[in-house]
């Protein structure tokens, strides 16, 4: 056997020993993408709605968007709603009927609009950097904190803001009577009134009544 024949025989032998390649499936199954289940938002409860309204009022007091007069009016409305809710519960063994909830929700919707309107109108507090102005702003900050924390009820807040509204009107009258300025006697009178208001704020924030 010559060299050429030897090479051809070896190649044929190798071909017989090697098995034919099997076709491999390249198709892969893809699981359909799953969408996480979503839970629809639950409507706010009556208590949550009241808390939300008070938080919005507190923010308005803190920022100066709500004047004492506006806050007094809003909190008076909230007090009336709370009284109405209490009466509803008393009439139904501590529970609220579906009709009660619908009525309260409609009234809270109106109050919500009132809060928005008062916070976005032209009436805002700008107390300035004077000693009297800083005292006025400090009182508002303390009231806002009490509203936010629940230490102050809507009724208590209305009374405190009524007092602040009266002081602010008196300060405005004093300034008008003296070319836009306060005399030393004016400052003394205002400071004494704010001392009384400060005690009222403290007492109402630390009594047994809290927002329910």
Feature map (PLM): residue ranges:
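Surface-exposed, polar/charged faces of alpha-helical domains
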Residues: 41-44, 59-102, 106, 110-113, ...
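Eukaryotic intrinsically disordered low-complexity regulatory regions
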Residues: 46, 50-52, 57
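A structural motif
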Residues: 49-50, 134-138, 142
